Design a protein with these regions (language model features):
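N-terminal targeting signals for export/organelle localization
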Residues: 1-38, 145
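A short beta-strand-turn-helix
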Residues: 32-57
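Short pre-active-site segment immediately N-terminal to redox-active cysteine/selenocysteine motifs
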Residues: 56-59, 63-67, 110
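Loop/turn elements at helix/coil->beta-strand transitions in domains of secreted/extracellular proteins
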Residues: 56-59, 87-90, 119
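Structural micro-motif
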Residues: 58, 100, 106-115
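Thiol-based oxidoreductase modules, predominantly thioredoxin-like and allied folds used
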Residues: 63, 74-82, 86-101, 108
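C-type cytochrome heme c attachment motif
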Residues: 66-73, 113
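Non-catalytic, surface beta->alpha helical segment in thiol-disulfide oxidoreductase systems
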Residues: 110, 115-145
């Protein structure tokens, strides 16, 4: 009986772990490291003074930390927006604890901080959590006009 119970618990734990991994892979908001940022967004090393966007679509970058309550509230909103604007806007996230250099580059002093990058011109940033409707307004006004 104990052996059967143990086997059932192992199977359940494996199923939950596999399900959690599947959910992570489904994310439309892509995590950016410093190397990926240089490749996809802006090569800070070759052109540190003038922002030059390298992307093919406008972008939204969420600067966050795992321990930040407001950041955890913004994350599902970003996922919804990434689905809503799929094919029109790229969505990324940067963990400020792991990518301190990127946080410093954009003078992130308070999180969440969301960077809106248009195809042409300079990025704009919004500090603090906002409603989904406010993020939609920012995207429509600053990225898709």
């Amino acid at each position: 009986m104990r052996k059967t119970l143990l086997i059932a618990m192992v199977i359940l734990a494996t199923a939950f772990t596999a399900n959690a991994q599947d959910k992570k892979e489904e994310s439309k908001v892509k995590q950016l490291t410093y190397k990926e940022f240089i490749k996809k967004i802006w090569n800070i090393e070759s052109n540190p003074r003038a922002f030059s966007y390298r992307g093919s679509l406008p972008a939204v970058i969420d600067f966050y930390a795992d321990w930040c309550g407001p950041c955890r509230r913004v994350a599902p909103i970003m996922e919804e927006l990434a689905q809503k604007y799929e094919g029109r806007v790229l969505f990324y996230k940067v963990n400020v604890d792991q990518e301190r250099g990127l946080a410093s580059t954009f003078q992130v002093q308070s999180i969440p901080m969301v960077l809106f990058i248009p195809m042409e011109g300079q990025p704009s940033k919004q500090v603090g959590a906002m409603s989904k409707e406010d993020y939609i307004r920012f995207i429509e006004d600053r990225l898709l006009k």
